[in-house]
Amino acid sequence: ATGVRYREKAGYVRIGTDSSVVTLTAGAEMATQFGGTIHHYLGAAQPMHLPGGLREAFYAFVAKGGSDPTDGDGYANASGNTVGAWRFALTARSRREKMAARLYYDHFFEDESAAFDEYGWLDGLIGLELSLPLQSLHTVVAEFVRTDYQSGPVYHDHTPQLEEQVSGIDNYYNHGLYPGWQHFGMAMGNALFASPLYDHNGTLLFT
């Protein structure tokens, strides 16, 4: 893909200050790739030009609306490639010992069902950061990430015969039109995602 546009936004609320004994932070971050030209889509000789004007910029901002040329009749995907995360952190401090502990959780999503708990928040990153009053060891961080649930193992678009919508198989960081959430084969935004560069299979797909 060439000429792709990018929009990023974030918003947070914090209860407490840097000097409070307990601080709670909660918010969300979202980023969208949209517009540009897609080359060799399914082996096509002609490039596919995707709209990237003000309307699509608005769709990218609200993460809703729009479509792309590959949508079937009656099926409209949101414009562009959107990723995001709900982020929460709880920090506790000991003023006397100059110690602090921060427990944090990131729930990442790529569609509306994952963003709004339609199938449960089973994928995400949970971490613990300890700040110690030692010169030789100042900070200890432990993190665990899970990505194998992906809203379940089934994806089914609603049809007149079967109206139920099942929005599983989120396939994190991959996209049907854009070459994944990577830069020169390296994952962006999450160090615990295995980058496509290391697969040595000639693709930019996250597996």
What are these language model-derived features?
Residues 2-7, 37-80:
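Primarily recognizes Gram-negative and organellar outer-membrane beta-barrels
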Residues 7-9, 14-22, 55-72, 89-93, ...:
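Elongated scaffolding segments in large macromolecular assemblies
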Residues 69-207:
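Outer-membrane beta-barrel pore domains
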Residues 1-44:
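Internal, well-ordered domain-core segments that constitute the primary functional module
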